[in-house]
Amino acid sequence: GFIFQGFNLIPALTAIENVELPLIYRGMPAGERRRLAKAALEAVGLEKRMSHRPAEMSGGQQQRVAIARAVAAKPPIIMADEPTGNLDSGSGKEIMDQLSELNRQGTSIILITHDNKLAEMARRIVTISDGHIISDRAGRGYA
């Protein structure tokens, strides 16, 4: 799964339809798609926004739809580009807690961030500058 910094939601689709879209491409049956999409949206606190389109949601809500889309199918790896960048600190903590739980369940998380506090939550921190690894060290260990 991939969590885009810029959401990349389809404006004409509702939140639940945006989350279901990658599941369609996996060939998943409609009932299972709907169940997984609903559970993912509930997990990010958007159970009351499932029928809303992106233009009807705040930036933080759109980011949470993007996160739900990435995690709905429980992929083995999630690449997250600034996943909490558009969220308030409380919502950001909830998202990081969710990513941590996914990691405990066996999902690998690759987190791209400029936020040092967020980076410190990881088990391993690789710092890249101009395309080169300049450090590779242990973090405090969320994931």
Residue ranges and their predicted role:
Residues 124, 132-143:
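Conserved beta-strand-loop-alpha-helix hinge in the C-terminal portion
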Residues 1-128:
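ABC family nucleotide-binding domain
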